[in-house]
Structure formats: C-alpha cells, structure tokens
Amino acid sequence: MKISVRNLEPTKVKLTVTVEPEELNPYLDAARKEIAKQVNVPGFRKGHVPGKIIDQRIGFAAVAGEAVNDAVPELYSKALEEKKIRPMAQPEFDVQDVPQSANDETKLKFTATVERRPDIELPEIDGLEIAISKPEVKDEDVDKRLEALRQRFGTLVGVDRPAAKGDFANIDLTAEIDGETVDSQEGVSYELGSNTMLDGLDEALDGLSAGEETTFEGTLEAGEHEGQKATVKVKVNSVKAEELPELNDEFASEASEFDTLDELKADIRKAAAQDAEGRQATEARDAFIAKLQEGLEIPVPKGVKANMVEEQLKGMTPDPEKATKEQKAQAEETVEKDLRDQMVLDALAEKLDVQVSQSDVFNFLASIAQQYGMDPNNFIQAIIKNGQLGSAVQEVGRSKGLLAGMRAVKFTADGEVVDLSAFLGEAAEDEESESVEAASAAAAVADELSAKDDAKDAE
C-alpha cells in the first residue's frame, strides 16, 4: 500500500492511498463469500457458490463495490497509523480507481480528506515548577455560608409598605408590542434586586406598594418574541419581607447536628477549607494546562470548531441562527479553549505513553450510567452502537494523562510546596474520569437514551 500525504491546512490533510492487487484480494474474496450467502444459484448450495461463478452471475462490479466499502475504512485507519495522523473528524472519501474485472491489474486508489490534530511540541515536565494561590478561609467566608444557611430557615412575612431590595413581591406581568399583548403571567413571586427576569423590572418595582402598578420598556428574553422591545405592565399584588432567625445555639441545633453556634461555625470553617483546597486543585489543573501551552501557537480545526460552536449556541439560545454577536463570540472563545486543551492533553497522554485499559473505560462509562440511573451494560452497548466508544477511550486517556503529568510537576504557593496527593492519587483519578468534561461524549448518549425512555413512558 502506497500512501502520500498532502497538507492542505495546518489542521487538514489529504491522503492518497494506492492499494496493491494482493492487498485487495482478501476483501474481494470476503465480498464473494458474503454475496454467496445471500443469493440462490442453480446447482450450488447457498453459501457455497464459487467465486468465479459469483463474478459471472452477479457481476464483478457488485463484488468490487462491497469489497471497496469494507476495504477503504480499514485501509484508511492503517494509513493514519502509519503516518501518525490523529484525525479529529470524519473523513471525506473519494474512490478514484477500482479494478473492473478479476484479471484487471488496476490498483484500488482512493483519497481521504480529514481534519487532524496539529503537531504539538510539549515542554519537558519533569522538574517543572508552577506557582498557584494559597487557599484561604476568611471570617467573611464563614459568615456568608452561615448567612446562607440562616436564609434557608427564613420565613416571608407580609408588610404594609413600599417594596425595597430584598423583598419578595407577588406580581402580574403583561408584555405588549405595538399595542398587542404577546405574553402575560400572573402570581409570579419575584425577589427585588435579584435581576433574574426582565431588565428594568427591579427599578420598576422599587417603591411600589400592594395594589399599585406601573409600566416600563424592556427586552423580552424568551419565547417567540425573544430579543424584541416590549412595553411591560407590572402590578404588585403583595409585598413580603424575609424574617431571619436569630443566630444562637437554638438556631444551630435546629439547622444542624450541632448543639452550639460555635460548633456549627467550626464545621462551616472546615467545609470552607475543604472547598478552598478543591479550588486550589482546580487552579493547579488550569495552570498546568496553561503552562503546557505557553509559547505555543496551536491552530484549531475549522470544521470541528464550527460544529462545536453550533452545539454551544444551542445551549445558549433556542434559535442559534438568531444568536447575538456577543453569544457567538463567547461560544467561539469557549470552543477554541476547549479544543486546544483537548489537543494538548491528547498530546500529553501520548508523550507519557498513557495506557487505557478495558476496565478503565468500563468504570468510566459505568459511573456515567449510574449518574443517569441506567443499567451499565445497556448503557455501554448503546455507547458502542452510537459510535461513541472511541470518544470515551480518548476522554479517559486525557484524564489519566492529566493526572500523571500533574504528579510529575511541583506546585508551590508562597514558596512552599503544595501537597495535591489527595486530588492526584488513584481515588482522584476515578473522580477526574467522572468529571463533567470527561463525561461529555458519554453523557450526550445518556441524554438521548433518557429521552427515548421518557417517550416510551409517555406512550
């Protein structure tokens, strides 16, 4: 097999593969045997028709067609391996030459155009030192958590005064465009100052009492008229203020397993410290990946990027075609970073010769299945059927490579070595492989299967 590679772009190549007759013959023989199982030829038992008879009765073109369909993907994979090309998308095949008869010496020739991972020269990581922040737990952090817990036990009490920031108003909303009502809602509970609904609503409600109403101009953020300006009428039905419990031992015993407020605060501080250490580990991960990319120009495959941006926009707006410039720019920035991170981690896994075992992949997929409440074996079969197994293997490899790389690096905070063993040990490896980033490919299939199950239940 002769393989030539032409670089079309830094991330796109065109392979031309020429196959010798003796390499194609096994595929032709296999095609004849498969066809023999499907046809009836007088004088021969089904499945036992000689190849020459198949060529004569069915036609060599049919044999060659089936052989080429089987041969091209397999030979393409061998060509990628031989030339050390790492594809990032499905190829575009163009079969140019095919033998027309059993005696035809014409060689099978095809091209494959595919987006690939660019060559990435990673720095040596042994002995590398990376500075990160020192985890801190301030009194304000404890106070914020304590206040959040306190708010969970708060009650809403009606007040006879104008609404102010922090109050909860029960409101009716009506939106009009050119005098026509396009949307309305009644009995909506809204916290003033939360800015979780229409822009301008907080300002409109500030100072209104129960029974009063006003209008303001706002941009609709959902529905058929998303993005359009509308005149919004808002009426206040009632105003309630949040009444919080007093911070004392009684509150501590009611809100937690502790008898005193001091014990509760100590536990909150401990939890805050653990969270701070977790954030430090995340910072270390991000700093490590950034260090690997330092000084490198890493091009991004255009087609892969376009597809990922489209998927990103689907999660940002109901109609991606109506996405704003800001949304498109945000999606492109996110996708480019994700792609560069993925490509760097793939290169790192290769550099460190990371091996992904069958049990690694099974444990990874089983953890995703568990999150979705699905049978692991059924889920894994679905992953295979949907062609996602390769993606799962790749994700596990990235995770293992990342952890192995971070173990080889020294992280420091204020000049002191940081011990990240709790996050980089074997247990952490399991947790990392279950992360949202690593689970993306498998979770997509899980969503699809869950949707199908819901549809069946609805029937």
Curated annotation (Swiss-Prot):
InterPro entries: PPIase_dom_sf (IPR046357), PPIase_FKBP_dom (IPR001179), Trig_fac (IPR005215), Trigger_fac_C (IPR008880), Trigger_fac_C_sf (IPR037041), Trigger_fac_ribosome-bd_bac (IPR008881), Trigger_fac_ribosome-bd_sf (IPR036611), Trigger_fact/SurA_dom_sf (IPR027304). Keywords: Cell cycle, Cell division, Chaperone, Cytoplasm, Isomerase, Rotamase. Its main location: cytoplasm. GO terms for biological process: 'de novo' cotranslational protein folding; cell division; chaperone-mediated protein folding; protein transport; protein unfolding. GO terms for cellular component: cytoplasm. It is found in: Cytoplasm. Pfam families: FKBP_C (PF00254), Trigger_C (PF05698), Trigger_N (PF05697). Coiled coil: none annotated. Its EC number is 5.2.1.8. PROSITE patterns: FKBP_PPIASE. GO terms for molecular function: peptidyl-prolyl cis-trans isomerase activity; protein folding chaperone; ribosome binding. It catalyses: [protein]-peptidylproline (omega=180) = [protein]-peptidylproline (omega=0). Residues 166-245 form the PPIase FKBP-type domain. Consists of 3 domains; the N-terminus binds the ribosome, the middle domain has PPIase activity, while the C-terminus has intrinsic chaperone activity on its own. Belongs to the FKBP-type PPIase family. Tig subfamily. Involved in protein export. Acts as a chaperone by maintaining the newly synthesized protein in an open conformation. Functions as a peptidyl-prolyl cis-trans isomerase. This is Trigger factor. It comes from Bifidobacterium longum (strain NCC 2705). The gene is tig.
